[in-house]
Amino acid sequence: AALTGHLVLSTLHANDAPSTIARLDEMGVEPFMVSASLIGIISQRLLRRVCSHCREPYRPEERELGRFGLMASREADVTFYRAHHHSPNEPICPHCQGSGYKGRVGIYEVLRIQEEMATAISKGASTDVIRQLALESGMVTLLGYSLELVRRGETTLEEVGRMVLTDSGLESERRARALSTMTCEGCGAGLQEGWLECPYCLTPRH
């Protein structure tokens, strides 16, 4: 139906938006059909929202920030929060019932199929190539979206690590970004002009 001009909305389980192309291929959908009919992909998840009444401000260590691809110097003005863990003799927060979290907030990754992307899909491009093209066109990843919520005080690094951050996922994102930037010899992460060492693995830059 999509090939004949109808707007078709469907759901599919995949780790992120770029991985959806591979999932369609596994289901037997030919690449040329995907490139001709697909206009966009939205990947979404839910994170627990940290309780605004009992959350605790703190300063993450560089190692913790590095795990998420963040640099302490760039996050100096950000107030990070973590969930409050109540002790046995402490009154329970009436708003979150002592869980430290109340409600949920959505995170989204929107991949728009543009001409260059469609051409790559029709040629059977790998997920890494699809991800690289998506990042170059301005796609905000699930990790990037969730870290922005952390900066706004809506959730925690702990929750992002639990629900979003995976070694393979972060490595794929780093690899895609590194293809068009200077690359760390230690972990392959993309580097920027002026960095003396890799913020992710602390390997000195040569």
Positions of predicted regions on the chain:
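Short, flexible helix-loop junctions that flank or precede catalytic/ligand sites
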Residues: 1-206
